[in-house]
Curated annotation (Swiss-Prot):
Enzyme Commission identifier(s): 2.5.1.6
Lineage summary: Eukaryota, Viridiplantae, Streptophyta, Embryophyta, Tracheophyta
Keyword ATP-binding tagged: yes
Role summary: Catalyzes the formation of S-adenosylmethionine from methionine and ATP. The reaction comprises two steps that are both catalyzed by the same enzyme: formation of S-adenosylmethionine (AdoMet) and triphosphate, and subsequent hydrolysis of the triphosphate.
Annotated positions binding Mg(2+): 9
Organism for this UniProt entry: Solanum tuberosum
Keywords from the UniProt entry: ATP-binding, Cobalt, Cytoplasm, Magnesium, Metal-binding, Nucleotide-binding, One-carbon metabolism, Potassium, Transferase
Classification via CDD domains: S-AdoMet_synt
Cofactors that this protein relies on: Mn(2+); Mg(2+); Co(2+); K(+)
Gene: METK1
Record protein name field: S-adenosylmethionine synthase 1
Gene Ontology MF terms: ATP binding; metal ion binding; methionine adenosyltransferase activity
Amino acid sequence: METFLFTSESVNEGHPDKLCDQISDAVLDACLEQDPESKVACETCTKTNLVMVFGEITTKAIVDYEKIVRDTCRNIGFVSDDVGLDADNCKVLVYIEQQSPDIAQGVHGHLTKRPEEIGAGDQGHMFGYATDETPELMPLSHVLATKLGARLTEVRKNGTCPWLRPDGKTQVTVEYCNDNGAMIPIKVHTVLISTQHDETVTNDEIARDLKEHVIKPVIPEKYLDEKTIFHLNPSGRFVIGGPHGDAGLTGRKIIIDTYGGWGAHGGGAFSGKDPTKVDRSGAYIVRQAAKSIVASGLARRCIVQVSYAIGVPEPLSVFVDTYGTGKIPDKEILKIVKENFDFRPGMMSINLDLKRGGNGRFLKTAAYGHFGRDDPDFTWEVVKPLKWEKPQD
């Protein structure tokens, strides 16, 4: 049996880039909660003792940007300079302007257009992907890397591993076999975890705790054997972390946010963007389309692409590829996708309820992936029953 290795990485919520994603989405939540028509393009950057929020926001909401920044940093665990950032004493800069009137008239006619007339907020192309190798219909390498990152945070916050600090990265290499286009995971080849830690803990304690409290609960035993390679804090020391260790920026972790290197990516980031930005809403609807195709049994693996022009409601193109796993030809599946999914931005907002913010809805998406999550707020993960004319035998 011929096999190959494929690797996906993740970072947890204390990574500086992910901190920025979460702040940008916390701002989006606050705007949408008070004004569902808010137009938000919110970027964040951070370095030692500094967080800056900047971008274009047009909203009726009254938003305390500085409070959102400090609350988000505090909730992640950035409560002192020792751990990489002090939420209560760091410098917070805010540079927010209104959305360009040129963009506003072209996209939503200054809020005069009906939902089906609303144009895409920008040009671009987005991809959705699904595979039957896990219950989430997501790639196993990505699922495991993401869950390891989430588990690192869990054992830090619940006190199981008190030596942990907020910043951390994970990476999982899986050995796969290609079954006529479908991906079959054979075993986990390599597990890599680099996590920030305090001054007192030894490397042996780190390795022992990570194996016992992080890896064991996350990776099913059937995927591990005596040949599995573990790299646990291979650099030997990771005390300085968070924004003190590295600068952070919104939109720098787009592969971690999506499919871990599987499928494809159009390049547009998600966090801090309202649903008229098709970078986000377009990627969400094509994930729902790909997932629904695989869940319905029409294919074992599927990628869907959609593309847009600024100000134009209808997509320019829709593409489907099932990697040879389709039960019917791809052109038939493409027809089914077009008949069952409305790719116009205004209609995607309605059908996926994307104007509803608050309650940390979009903040939740900004760490541990936007897809494959079992949470009612992730409306794009709901499998849509597909209506189509089955060919007569």
